[in-house]
Each structure stands twice: as C-alpha cells, then as structure tokens.
Regions:
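N-proximal low-complexity "stem/linker" segments adjacent to membrane-targeting elements
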Residues: 1-23
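Acidic donor-binding segment of Leloir-type glycosyltransferases
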Residues: 22-67
Length: 102
C-alpha cells in the first residue's frame, strides 16, 4: 500500500494518527506538508515539529518521499499540488490527512 499523508502544523495529530496508520504497513509514504504562515513564528515551530515527528516515526519503517512547502500555500492549493506531485511517483495510493485516525 502507498500512502499520501498530508500534514501542516499539528504535531499532536501526527502522534495520534500515524501509529494507527503504520499498523497497516504501508510500503511507501509520500509526506506532504504546507509551509508556515508568513511572519508567524509559532506556526513555523508547529510546522517543524509536525514534520520532524512524522519523519522520526517513519524512519526505518518504509520508504519515505517528502514534499515540504517553504511558505504557506493554503489548504486547497497545497493539498492539490501535493497530491499531484505524489502521483508522479505512485500509480495508486490512499490519501489521509493528519487529523484522520483510521
């Protein structure tokens, strides 16, 4: 199974959802993250923590591809562009956001 996992600035959601997702033993994960809002240091810290937490949890578990935006693109544009990029790598995938606990 291939997974496209969409995250933003919620490390707590990553910590809740990713362990459950990993029980399904994904072969590859394409990690898509929007960037922090301009000038918002707290948002930048949360984005970085969410990214790092996801990477730490995925390390050694499966093949990981990353697509991390440097600046905030907004939900609609970031989700669309991230999924488009992921399907350049994957033929098929399950798509989940960090706040979806299967």
């Amino acid at each position: 199974m291939n997974l496209i996992y969409l995250i933003y600035n919620r490390p707590d959601c990553v910590e809740q959802s990713l362990p459950v997702i990993l029980e399904a033993c994904p072969k590859q994960v394409y990690l898509v993250a929007d960037g922090p809002k301009s000038g918002n240091e707290e948002d930048a810290r949360k984005c970085e923590r969410a990214r790092q937490r996801a990477l730490d949890m995925l390390d050694g578990v499966c093949e990981v591809h990353t697509d991390f935006a440097e600046e905030n693109r907004g939900c609609a544009r970031r989700v669309s562009s991230g999924i488009t990029q992921a399907f350049e790598v994957f033929d098929d995938a399950i798509i989940l956001e960090d706040d979806c606990v299967p």
